[in-house]
């Protein structure tokens, strides 16, 4: 089967996200502000509940380190973003009265609020002259598809460290950031914007450095052996082109679009040696394998009623490919050793709507969200059977999953349009108050949910450093 001719070079934006820079550049003069201006406010107004022997909700406001660590529920502040910092929202927007006034304590004055918000918007610079969570850290990225932002979660503190606001880069709230891919060293990350028809490239400091055009982009997958990336079409697109995109992530230039001869090609992945790409249809029980060297491709039928294969993933050893059927609750194991032929070797039943499986580095476990069951499933890849099903507070229409680099924590995004999860605090924002999206943090040593982060509207794609 023949490929399309190469496309024109992508447009690369000259914009940068300076408001989210994580380095301490030009921050030396601000290093003393916390001690002189910020800590005295917390000591006077907050210490009775958040210092010493009493730290309500686990929040210690006796030091910069304690503030940055956050509470049992997540971050207290987001550097460069006072408006979305819980501490500021509690003090200005809380339904029933500003905190701590509603608890019978003196509220912050306008001058004190201005001092705190200006400091946060300036980077929340600490005594060392740096913004919190600066440098090369292990981050998980979670898109807020309903509001045009991306959460940057630090895996050591398990808090939202930054929020990337795409509206500040010329996109609107309806750009629909969807899926994320991250380089193995964390140096760059990529996000698809469904409505904007773009794939964006950011540095780890969240500086926008590249862009490529692609109609209704959905899922991204990096070639483990080169700088290539493939991109499928969004699930939201009813009748997109029957092609997937192949581009270079160094240059951010589209190399070509590959014909896949199937409607709604959403799921995409690579063979581990980078020789083949695979795609599956949402509308039909069919997937395709494409040999990138020869251009030859083969279509493969999957038996049964329409499954709606949401995503494809290949194990680290390259021998098995998996996919979940949204409509049937089936989980498929394909034999990927041949690459051209991918026969089904086993099918099992799992909880409803298995989405976005990921693997640990050893390839012995697969983790996936069950969107219509409000659960997470762990599959033993050696036995190809369900090992554990996790449920609990915060799991509400789970969508994507990612692992911390040390594989201690599993992060699962939850869209919560079914209102299974209730907001901790009401801020007078009907969307947030009714449908707060979450990221559940699961400790894989115990398989227990240890933290529920409230992150924004319609959290979707969840990406961390790859496990290959």
Per-region residue spans from a language model:
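Intrinsic disorder/low-complexity segments
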Residues: 6-10, 26, 268
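Bacterial N-terminal signal peptides
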Residues: 8-19
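Alpha-helical interaction segments
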Residues: 10, 106-109, 180, 357
């Amino acid at each position: 089967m023949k490929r399309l001719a190469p496309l024109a070079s992508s447009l690369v934006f000259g914009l940068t996200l300076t408001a989210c820079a994580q380095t301490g550049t030009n921050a030396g003069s601000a290093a003393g502000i916390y001690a002189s201006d910020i800590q005295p406010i917390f000591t006077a107004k907050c210490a009775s509940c958040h210092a010493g022997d009493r730290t309500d909700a686990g929040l210690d406001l006796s030091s910069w380190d304690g503030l940055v660590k956050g509470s049992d529920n997540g971050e207290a502040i987001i550097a460069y973003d006072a408006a979305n910092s819980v501490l500021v929202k509690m003090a200005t927007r809380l339904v029933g009265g500003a905190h701590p006034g509603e608890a019978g304590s003196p509220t912050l004055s306008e001058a004190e609020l201005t001092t705190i918000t200006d400091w946060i918007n300036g980077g929340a610079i600490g005594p060392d002259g740096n913004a919190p969570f600066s440098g090369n850290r292990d981050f998980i990225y979670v898109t807020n598809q309903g509001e045009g932002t991306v959460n940057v979660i630090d895996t050591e503190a398990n808090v939202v460290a930054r929020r990337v606001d795409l509206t500040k880069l010329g996109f609107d709230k309806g750009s629909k950031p969807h899926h994320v891919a991250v380089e193995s060293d964390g140096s760059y990350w990529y996000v698809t914007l469904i409505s904007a028809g773009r794939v964006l490239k950011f540095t780890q400091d969240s500086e926008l450095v590249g862009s490529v055009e692609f109609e209704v982009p959905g899922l991204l997958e990096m070639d483990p052996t080169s700088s290539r990336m493939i991109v499928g079409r969004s699930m939201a697109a009813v009748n997109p082109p029957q092609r997937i995109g192949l581009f270079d992530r160094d240059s951010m230039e589209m190399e070509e679009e590959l014909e896949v001869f199937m409607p709604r090609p959403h799921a995409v992945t690579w063979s581990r040696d980078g020789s083949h790409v695979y795609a599956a249809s949402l509308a039909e029980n069919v997937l395709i394998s494409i040999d990138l060297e020869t251009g030859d491709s083969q279509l493969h039928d999957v038996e049964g009623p329409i499954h709606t294969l949401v995503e494809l993933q290949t194990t680290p050893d390259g021998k098995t490919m998996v996919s979940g059927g949204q409509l049937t609750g089936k989980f498929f194991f394909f034999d990927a050793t041949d690459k051209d032929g991918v026969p089904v070797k086993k099918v099992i039943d799992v909880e409803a709507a298995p989405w976005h499986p990921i693997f640990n580095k050893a390839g012995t476990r697969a983790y996936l969200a069950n969107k219509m069951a409000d659960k997470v499933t762990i599959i033993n890849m050696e036995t190809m059977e369900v090992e554990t099903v996790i449920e609990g507070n915060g799991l509400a229409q789970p969508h994507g999953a990612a692992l911390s680099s040390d594989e201690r924590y599993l992060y699962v995004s939850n869209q919560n349009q079914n209102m299974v999860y209730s907001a901790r605090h009401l801020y007078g924002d009907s969307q947030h108050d009714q449908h707060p999206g979450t990221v559940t943090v699961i400790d894989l040593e115990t398989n227990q949910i240890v933290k529920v982060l409230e992150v924004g509207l319609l959290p979707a794609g969840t990406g961390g450093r790859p496990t290959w």
